[in-house]
Amino acid sequence: MKNPRKIDLIVVHCSATRVNQDFPVEALEACHKARGFHSIGYHYYITKDGMVYPCRPENEVGAHARHYNAHSIGICYEGGLDEKGKPADTRTPAQKDSLEDLLYGLSLDYPDAEILG
């Protein structure tokens, strides 16, 4: 089904959790609901094992990038901080592979979208 929203951005986020901390999709959902969202604000979540969890339908506006939500797709990967809490690329090989595959598919669906993150 074609998305009725005009998507011109695909935004990649991290969960801003430490590399040695597990943050499963259930924890992400609880965190977002505690912030007042009706569900996870991202459209996709990628855990350390490379599993891609669809979270919000693409035709639904996300809650991940203020002022850009109406025309973007949001992806989040688990991690993003080293053991000391400093920003770091903590993506596992499985996450990198899954992210690449997901971005490829989304780029086919939204060929004019810019990828940020």
PLM features per residue range, with description:
Residues M1-I115:
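Active-site-adjacent loop/helix surface patches within enzyme catalytic domains
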